Amino acid sequence: MDHIRNFSIIAHIDHGKSTLADRIIQVCGGLADREMEAQVLDSMDIERERGITIKAQTAALSYRARDGKVYNLNLIDTPGHVDFSYEVSRSLSACEGALLVVDASQGVEAQTVANCYTAIELGVEVVPVLNKIDLPAANPENAIEEIEDVIGIDATDATRCSAKTGLGVEDVLESLIAKVPPPKGDPAAPLQALIIDSWFDNYVGVVMLVRIVNGTLRPKDKIKLMATGAQYPVEHIGVFTPKSRNLETLSAGQVGFIIAGIKELTAAKVGDTVTHATKAAVEPLPGFKEVKPQVFAGLYPVEANQYDALRESLEKLKLNDASLQYEPEVSQALGFGFRCGFLGLLHMEIVQERLEREFDMDLITTAPTVVYEVMMSDGAIIKVENPAKMPEPPRIEEIREPIVTVNLYMPQDYVGSVITLCEQKRGSQINMQYHGRQVQLTYEIPMAEIVLDFFDRLKSVSRGYASMDYEFKEYRAADVVKVDMLINGDKVDALSVIVHRSQSQYRGREVAAKMREIIPRQMYDVAIQATIGAHIIARENIKALRKNVLAKCYGGDISRKKKLLEKQKAGKKRMKQVGSVEIPQEAFLAILRVEDK
């Protein structure tokens, strides 16, 4: 076991994590040169395209070090984005070491810090690496200073490399072997294996990626998953080199896969412990928690007959993404669809994009909302994730909204505009620190404000230099109200939003004005109203189209004209009683684009 090293790579988006992984695999000869391709561990198209890693992947590599010994290196590739922070913490707890990759031209950024703190908390040895030193803009001294200043680990002897050209990659591996301790664990103890990730394979069912902490596993063993208590016979075990290779045993310290004919991905939860059914471990490995969605949105098919196809697509996506939750929902305006729960905004975008791209769905998405806690006047507490389900104001004692702690990092030139943005979003400043040219701001901001467009606006006010990560803090009582939109006195449920009272008037007026531009004129007057409970806060009218019924009257008696006008008026009135206003697709999207003032 002294020759095993389990490590992962942590970095901010675009600092070259996947490229470095490619180089390491190449140096260790994991794949022949002709099989090598860019971002070899990112298997989804969308991962390659956006340049982000979503699912964890592994590669078991052997490397002959300069001291002549052969080491087994297990590389566990982790996602870098905040939405997937739980997956990151599981991947890190399977390692003894982590390469902290920092772009020498950009320095430390938010997600680097967030994931690095997670690693330090889990007791993982962090090895700093400066990447992209071949760039003319690279400033390694500055980056080293930032690592020491912001994260507080010694980086004087940080290895310098360029993953793109392959320069210095062997030095990275040497310092990894020198600094990272070998895994501890007892091959003879009862089996304990941590599930790092799991996905669905069409041929063999669920594939579980595990790190064996104690014990030994062989094919035909009967295993038990501790969170659910379910038991399965093991069919295959092995490692990825990144290609899969079956083995006869997996023992303590190794990272590999288990295939046990599991049909449901929800059975193999990330972070759960696998043990033997007969000689079971006494307690599971620490750190397991059920992942709860933070952001909800309604997904509806554009064509009503696509509902079944959408359900199937969601089922297939759920096979590979256990954190996605959905339940059927009916909206009077949009018909049948699903209410989906996501880990965060990036997760939501990815799910939408995969539905559109891999399953050819045309979707309408309602405005994303967060989960509110509502205390009723009779003392009961309910959770509301859909504005349409919010109880009437008289029955509500108080509404509590989720507050998140946001860490922002940016060059000092942009501090002013970022602070202004946070103040607009009802944020309260907790902390502000200067690290050289970089500034770290900590704010508490209501999650609802972050969900809509905070990230985009942050990028635009800081010209793309600011980076952020956030974590849930608590529920706090807030003065929020539900704004409903009425069209000709009928409530349109899909347009309801929950906003802070201070913004409700403005929001109601803006949405009503947008609707007025978008809804086509009808044969009768259409009234668009925004209401809070029974109180109307904004109104817009769409004037009727009318035919000139007097065109054929030349001169003659006024009563003749009056009769025609009265007849037209009566017809319009009758029409208004039976007619329903078709709300075009754009109206629902318009709601998402109403800017806060």
Swiss-Prot record:
Root EC class: hydrolase
Intracellular or extracellular location(s): Cell inner membrane
One Gene Ontology term, aspect cellular component: plasma membrane
GO molecular function, one term: ribosome binding
Cross-referenced CDD domains: EF4_II, EF4_III, LepA, lepA_C
InterPro entries the UniProt entry points to: EF-4 (IPR006297), EFG_III/V (IPR035647), EFG_V-like (IPR000640), EFTu-like_2 (IPR004161), G_TR_CS (IPR031157), LepA_C_sf (IPR038363), LepA_CTD (IPR013842), LepA_IV (IPR035654)
EC number: 3.6.5.n1
UniProt GO BP: positive regulation of translation
Membrane topology: Peripheral membrane protein
Annotated residues for binding of GTP: 14-19, 131-134
Biological function: Required for accurate and efficient protein synthesis under certain stress conditions. May act as a fidelity factor of the translation reaction, by catalyzing a one-codon backward translocation of tRNAs on improperly translocated ribosomes. Back-translocation proceeds from a post-translocation (POST) complex to a pre-translocation (PRE) complex, thus giving elongation factor G a second chance to translocate the tRNAs correctly. Binds to ribosomes in a GTP-dependent manner.
Name of the protein in question: Elongation factor 4
